A protein has these predicted regions:
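FAD-site-proximal beta/loop scaffold in flavoenzymes
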Residues: 2-18, 107-184
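Rossmann-like dinucleotide-binding cores of NAD(P)H-dependent redox enzymes
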Residues: 13-14, 19-23, 29-103, 163-169, ...
Length: 193
C-alpha cells in the first residue's frame, strides 16, 4: 500500500475525490461495504475474493443475496480469485488477477483497495512497559475486556473478535458497564450483523 493509489480501508474513508474505477481486494464486511459505497457514488468497482463466495464468514443465503444485489447494481465480482501483482506507472494501475480457472486476467483501475484484514494497532503504545499479556498478536482479555494488569482494559481491533466499528462500540459499552458495576452479559460474537 502506498496510501495514494493502493490503499487500505482507512484511506478509502478519506479520499479527497471520487475515483473513476476501483478494484477492491477482499469481500468481507469492510470490502463489501466499501465496494457498495463507491459503486453508489458512481465508481466502477471490481470486487475480488479468494474464497468461493463473497462475505465468506456470513450465512450462504446472505452471501448469495448480496451477490445478486451487487450484480444488479453493476458491481463486478470475481470469486475463487487472487491478486497476483499490481503494476504502477503513469496512468491506471495494472492488476494481474488469477481467476477461478487459474488464468491470469489483467484489469486496470485508478485505485486498488486492500480489504483483506485489519492489523491490530499494538505497536509502540506502551503494552510492553505494562507487561500486558498478548495472544496471537492481540491483547488477551476476559469476557469483560480486562487485561492481566489490574485497571487496564482493551477493546476494538487490538483484541480478538471482528475488527468492526460497531463491534468495538458494543465492546466499549460492555466494558464500561462492567467497570461501573452494572450487571452485563458478555457479547455473543456469533450474532453480529
Amino acid at each position: 500500500q502506498d496510501g495514494k493509489r493502493i490503499i487500505g480501508y482507512r484511506q478509502a474513508l478519506t479520499l479527497d475525490h471520487k475515483p473513476e474505477s476501483m478494484i477492491v481486494v477482499g469481500s468481507g464486511a469492510i470490502g463489501s461495504e466499501l465496494a457498495y459505497f463507491y459503486n453508489a457514488m458512481g465508481t466502477k468497482v471490481l470486487l475480488v475474493e479468494f474464497m468461493p463466495t463473497i462475505l465468506p464468514l456470513e450465512d450462504e443465503e446472505v452471501s448469495k443475496q448480496v451477490g445478486r444485489s451487487f450484480k444488479k447494481a453493476g458491481i463486478d465480482v470475481m470469486v475463487k480469485s487472487s491478486v497476483e501483482s499490481v503494476e504502477s506507472g503513469e496512468g491506471l494501475l495494472k492488476v494481474n488477477i488469477k481467476n477461478k480457472k487459474g488464468e491470469i486476467e489483467i484489469h486496470e483501475a485508478e485505485i486498488v483497495l486492500s480489504a483483506v484484514g485489519i492489523a491490530p494497532n499494538v505497536e509502540n503504545i506502551g503494552l510492553e512497559e505494562l507487561n500486558i499479556e498478548m495472544e496471537r498478536g492481540r491483547v488477551k482479555v476476559d469476557d469483560y475486556y480486562r487485561t492481566n494488569v489490574e485497571g487496564v482494559y482493551a477493546i476494538g481491533d487490538i483484541v480478538h473478535g471482528p475488527a468492526l466499528a460497531h463491534v468495538a462500540s458494543a465492546e466499549a459499552i460492555c466494558c464500561v458497564e462492567h467497570i461501573a458495576g452494572v450487571h452485563t452479559e458478555p457479547i455473543d460474537y456469533t450474532n453480529i450483523p
